[in-house]
Amino acid sequence: MAKGDKINFSTPSGFPEFLPSEKRLELYLLDIIRRVFESYGFTPIETPAVERLEVLQAKGNQGDNIIYGIDPILPPNRQAEKDKSGETGKDKSGETGSEARALKFDQTVPLAAYIARHLNELIFPFARYQTDMVFRGERAKDGRFRQFRQCDIDVVARRELSLLYDAQMPAIITEIFEAINIGDFLIRINNRKVLTGFFKSVGITEDKIKSCINIVDNLEKIGESKVKQELEKEGVSGEQTQKIIDFIKIDGSVDEVLDKLKHLTLNLPETEQLSLGISELETVIAGVRNLGVTENRFCIDLSIARGLDYYTGTVYETTLLGHEALGSICSGGRYEELVGVFLGEKMPGVGISIGLTRLISRLLKAGILSTLAATPAQVMVVNMQEDLMPTYLKVSQHLRQAGINVITNFDKRPLGKQFQLADKQGIQFCVIIGSEEAAAQKSSLKDLKSGEQVEVLLVNLAEEVKRRLS
């Protein structure tokens, strides 16, 4: 860069940063999410932001179009050394030049690699949660980011994994969103075996089933007419297309949908996989009910497929009622062979994911959530006179030891300006101590919301503040 050139210090497109009030909201929601995850016994882990590219590409090509590749930017002397190291393929750091690296685009594929690396150190079924950042090289637009925080849970087993783990997922989703208090939401549940089995029974060939499922999964985005067109482009006949449309539009209560599915199997050929999917769906639904999730929170939706190739059984999508345009706010499902890519053995798993950065952005824009105060401080001890600073420090520390968040104002300025500063930061209470109050071991406690001001003995100050905060 030439001397005098201006540096563009704006953030790259799609890489968000947060003001204090926004970051505090994210941390508040993270606390709720972690608390619910841990109440079900999920344990935290962290995986690297960077993985070998071959790891991220290990299960199909679902991530190829969104993977961010990276490579170190070496100074000229290091680059020359690396260029000279062509015979060994390594530079002085020991890095192999041919090893392509990339930023993780989700948490599930890195989890599979993590389990493969630590197989003998983990206890199975292994239930973990992560709240890391992920990175996607897709076009940035409103509500979609290239870097965002994703909150995931997964349970993985060595051989068999009970379907009751699948049933826990809607219960966990329900507890989180009820605690956040975002309004009415609906968890839509399906099973990929139901879709795959039905497609087989109406004569869709094996090589076309995945692409047809992906088309059906886009029903809400592109509409029924476009789905029909796309299916016909895949070589699906008009009669088959209509059967598929009629199938994914089956609705009613959970029990009504299950009854309709069972009745359907009586009139179709090759229904073994379809029947297995229905049986799994029944088991999961029974578990969801036993966990206390009410039916206004979940339904069976046969159009839900989840586009990622690795899902093989139960799948979930959650929508906010009245705000369906926001899209899915939590999704996931069961996979059977994802971890086996690295180990060569069947290791079934089930999990869900909340794209927290996207969710916060959407809910703030829709007015469903509001940011928090710019500071966690609940009290400001104002600066009336410099010679009383030792008293202000002692009072501040006494309040902190009582569990109250406190800012001590070290700058001397007019009292009204100090009140304005506290109010601007969202601080509700100011503690005022002048020479007379200090001599009498008293303070004035001012509520900036109501304007009320009361006299309180210093020995009772923490108790009074806590009473008013509650």
Curated annotation (Swiss-Prot):
Protein's name in the database: Histidine--tRNA ligase
Keywords, in A-Z order: Aminoacyl-tRNA synthetase, ATP-binding, Cytoplasm, Ligase, Nucleotide-binding, Protein biosynthesis
Assembly information from the UniProt record: Homodimer.
Stored PROSITE patterns: AA_TRNA_LIGASE_II
EC number(s) stated in the UniProt entry for this protein: 6.1.1.21
Alphabetical list of CDD domains matching this protein: HisRS-like_core, HisRS_anticodon
Top-level EC class as recorded in UniProt: ligase
A single Gene Ontology CC term: cytoplasm
Chain intervals with Basic and acidic residues compositional bias: 79-94
Chief site of localization: cytoplasm
Similarity annotation: Belongs to the class-II aminoacyl-tRNA synthetase family.
GO MF: ATP binding; histidine-tRNA ligase activity
